[in-house]
């Protein structure tokens, strides 16, 4: 899977700067509007179990290769299932970390929603903060140094772009090379 970003044109048909998807139902909104594909095993379990998925299905997605941290390439990573590894450059990871620290985004740590627990008073409370934080698996690659994801060898090549840490990938399989 390569990148998981938003299409400005597609989102612009339905949303604006001050009108976005509903916070508590955003994944369903994205499905209904045709913005995100409905693929079982791709999305966060805490979201998926409130959709047509049960959230426990196996995933066929081995990883996400992130070319860089512009939103048209990474905006939908917060919807990604937390156990699917994200492969990126150190620079891209730092940019994603900055997004997490300066906004309500959840690029590197998924904070589970819809989690309830019995508090000390014996009543039900909504779990928040570190109680519901699940760190995502982020794998840092070195520029120009080949690495493997299952049977695919990935060759990350640096690309000049408007932010640091941008890479193109050449994928080497037993049958062919893509890139």
Q: What residue ranges belong to the model's regions?
A:
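Histidine-centered divalent metal-coordination motifs
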Residues: 63-73, 161
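Short hydrophobic-aromatic micro-motifs
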Residues: 1-3, 31, 88, 153-156, ...
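Eukaryote-biased recognition of long, low-complexity, charge-rich segments
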Residues: 135-137
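Short, conserved loop/helix-junction motifs that constitute active-site signature segments
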Residues: 79-81
């Amino acid at each position: 899977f390569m990148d998981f970003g938003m299409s400005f044109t597609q989102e612009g048909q339905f949303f604006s700067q001050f009108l976005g998807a509903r916070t508590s139902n955003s994944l369903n909104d994205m499905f209904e509007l045709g913005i995100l594909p409905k693929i079982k095993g791709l999305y966060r379990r805490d979201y998926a179990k409130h959709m047509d998925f049960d959230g426990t299905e196996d995933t066929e997605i081995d990883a996400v290769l992130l070319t860089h941290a512009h939103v048209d390439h990474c905006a939908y990573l917060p919807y990604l299932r937390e156990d699917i590894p994200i492969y990126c450059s150190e620079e891209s990871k730092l940019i994603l970390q900055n997004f997490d620290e300066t906004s309500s985004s959840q690029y590197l740590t998924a904070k589970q929603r819809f989690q309830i627990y019995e508090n000390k008073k014996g009543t039900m409370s909504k779990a928040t903060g570190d109680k519901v934080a699940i760190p995502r698996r982020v794998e840092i690659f070195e520029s120009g140094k080949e690495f493997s994801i299952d049977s695919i060898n990935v060759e990350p090549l640096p690309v000049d772009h408007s932010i640091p840490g941008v890479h193109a990938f050449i994928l080497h399989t037993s049958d062919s090379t893509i890139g």
